Amino acid sequence: MNVSAIIVEYNPMHNGHLYHIKKTKELTNCDALVCIMSGNFVQRGFPSILDKWTKANMAISNGVDLVIELPTLYSLSSAEFFSFGAVSTLDSLNIINSICFGSEIGNINALQDIATTLLEEPLEYKILLKNYLDKGISFAKARNLALVELNRDNKIMSENINKILSLSNNILGIEYLKSLLLLNSSIKPFTITREGADYKDENLHKEYSSASSIRKYLKENKNINILKDFLPLEGFLEFKRLITKGYNFSMEDSMINYIRYKYISGYKNLHNLIDVSEGLDNRIYKSLEKNFTYDSLVGEIKSKRYAYSRIGRILCQYFIGFENYDLNSLLKSTPNYMRVLASNEAGLKVLKKIKKHSSTNIYTKVPKNTNTLLNLDIKATNAYSLLNNNIRFNEDYFRSPIIIKNTIY
């Protein structure tokens, strides 16, 4: 059985994601497609616009065979740890033959070369990186500049590196490849050229629009018929239903109110979060005293050194309560379980194969004794339930995987 995998967030699922599913199947010729998906919080530093079960259901309805949850610890981490959490989980299953991701360059060899350099970290690269970081430049930009300078004698390579590392999906793809190399994984990587608008583009475009533009439109408009051209049918109908129910499409703004209350109640322990360097905690506290929306708060805090998404992840972590955990130890470990969110009949066959070939614990229901990673997922859902009225407190304990039978693609 040839099993391929994709790493996704679906915030929300749109036509570009359908293209990714279709091209993955064509490129890998797989018999089954597994996706590991961020749950109720996503890597850009937002609460997910739809809950994880609704997203999983849409994925199965649109060509995925098995959906498993990426632990919240990883979904709210940097690209490096996000990728490692996803890839190490997939690798531990011992049945995944390939992984396919979208990138702007669409060239797996170019991405592999950069990934190898970043993993091996030659001394000159380390020195260059430190010099740029000492100037107050963000890690991502400092890394780009160091790599360009490392290849300064090769003009073509230097120009290509700068172009590759300026685009978000290339960067994430490199992190996937680094994780595969680090794990000495047998999973074969593939990439497809990403179609459509950049994820930061907030304008709707014909056929392929970014998730950001769709979220923005949902926040600002009640008539969503225009979105029918950009979403799978299930997604369009779900959003149409939610609008009639007065759904909260601005959950990040609601989250800020809870965060402000936590701060004024005396919980000043942001410094325990690993992404919070010295002084950043006080910068956030001061901003919380005068900003009432997510965009205004993050906009005031962000700087050359502190990227928008990094601040967003810190706020989500603080909202959930990450500061009470030993995050350094957790991030250095590999997940020892997989949480099933949804499946079809082909996915059930994949699960049987996993049980036969892997020692990874498969959870279809929350066990009595939860490990720390799973406990964080439960806390994340409980925090999310404060923002999304469709989700109950302790929803993780009530939900079983969604099983859809007789889906054919």
Curated annotation (Swiss-Prot):
NCBIfam families, sorted: PRK13670.1 (NF010191)
Subcellular locations according to the entry: Cytoplasm
Function: Catalyzes the formation of N(4)-acetylcytidine (ac(4)C) at the wobble position of elongator tRNA(Met), using acetate and ATP as substrates. First activates an acetate ion to form acetyladenylate (Ac-AMP) and then transfers the acetyl group to tRNA to form ac(4)C34.
Name this protein carries in UniProt: tRNA(Met) cytidine acetate ligase
Source organism phylogeny: Bacteria, Bacillati, Bacillota, Clostridia, Eubacteriales
Species annotation: Clostridium botulinum (strain 657 / Type Ba4)
Gene it is expressed from: tmcAL
Residues noted as binding ATP in the record, renumbered to the chain: 7-20, 102, 169, 194
Major place of residence: cytoplasm
GO cellular component entries: cytoplasm
Enzyme class: ligase
GO MF terms held by the record: ATP binding; ligase activity, forming carbon-nitrogen bonds; tRNA binding
UniProtKB keywords: ATP-binding, Cytoplasm, Ligase, Nucleotide-binding, RNA-binding, tRNA processing, tRNA-binding
Any Gene Ontology biological process: tRNA modification
